[in-house]
A protein has these predicted regions:
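Edge beta-strand at a domain terminus
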Residues: 1-2, 51, 56, 97-130
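Central antiparallel beta-sheet cores of small beta-barrel/beta-sandwich binding domains
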Residues: 2-96, 120
Length: 130
């Protein structure tokens, strides 16, 4: 482990994932804030960047990490309400690497008849850009 490495320093910066999405993060005192710019989408997103909130916990060889983003999809209404989806990522950053993998859950706002289709899951590979 690099003796100069810190979770706060590493997690503050810009990252890109394997799908071409990127995020700008600020890590301080165990909390993460920033903006997430998603590339893949099933609809036109209401804004280019979405707020990121999360937490991290420093551990001996890196940090445990959780992030959440809520997406608003433009022009799609359900029962008069705007369409939203929400994603969470969980993973571990190793102090010996500049990249990391995070498992994600994407929850779409579906009515109870389509509840089975509401949740998708997968894994993203993030690389620090700066």
């Amino acid at each position: 482990m690099d003796s100069n490495w810190s979770a706060e320093k590493f997690l503050t910066g810009e990252f890109e994932n394997n799908l071409g999405s990127h995020c700008k993060l600020i890590a301080k005192d165990g909390k993460i804030t920033g903006e997430y710019f998603t590339k893949p989408s099933r609809g036109k997103l209401i804004q280019p960047g979405f707020p990121v909130n999360g937490i991290y916990t420093p551990v001996k060889d890196g940090a445990l990490l959780t992030m959440i983003v809520t997406y608003k999809i433009e022009g799609v209404k359900e029962n008069g309400l705007e369409r939203y989806s929400q994603a969470t990522w969980n993973g571990k950053v190793y102090s010996s690497k500049k990249d990391f993998k995070m498992n994600w859950l994407l929850l779409n706002n579906e009515d109870e008849n389509n509840e089975w289709a509401a949740t998708n899951l997968g894994q993203d590979h993030f690389t620090k850009k700066n």
